[in-house]
Amino acid sequence: MSLLKVVGLKKSFDGLRAVDGLSFEVTQGEVLALLGPNGSGKTTAMNLISGALRADAGEVWLGEQSITGLPAHRIARLGVARTFQLVRVLGGMSCIENVEAGLAFRRDHRFGAGARNEAIALLTRVGLAGSADVLARELTYIDQKRLELARALALRPQVLLLDEWLAGLNPTELQQGIKRIRELRTQGLTIVLIEHVMDAVRALCDRCVVMASGAKLAEGDTRSVLARDEVIAAYLGAPYA
């Protein structure tokens, strides 16, 4: 049974169709990659799923509940958390306060000493054990990504949406990031990720959905999809297919 189901999503901006009838499903515990060249509609699709944008048409289902058209904060409380392509941390707050904000926002509203202990555990989980009282704006870009992940995990999501979370990492950081995502998967978390690092996609993802010009170009298991001529052509041009 699918945990996340996207049916016929459409979104246009000033007559330009950014997402054109996109449909796919993700099962419990699966890691699915949403791929495509720059401008293919991937982040717009993720914004539609998370409620950051309202779709012109189509439906999004979380389990048996429609989350179509709900505002982002309600979708987050129902169990869909995300990170962003351009990192969004609360720069004037400490790392632990950023994570505590996520804890306060979820359904069981954690506050006080219990929330602090859980926030420290989440910071430790993403590799920020010694940064609890550091202002978020003082972190490196990579550590801000880790903080954003900790804040998303504070919501105890059913589905985690990662928008290029592995981008910009050096080889050592990339392997650490892949390991972290694998650990989340072993804990039963369902993950949809946008990624251009193909080594990470091959290492992590069960299936791929490839977009081009807003529409779905291909879907299937990772190895076979990445070998398809039309997918290679979408990324590199027809002469390389």
Regions found by a protein language model. Name each.
Residues S2-A241:
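Glycine-rich phosphate-binding loops of nucleotide-dependent enzymes
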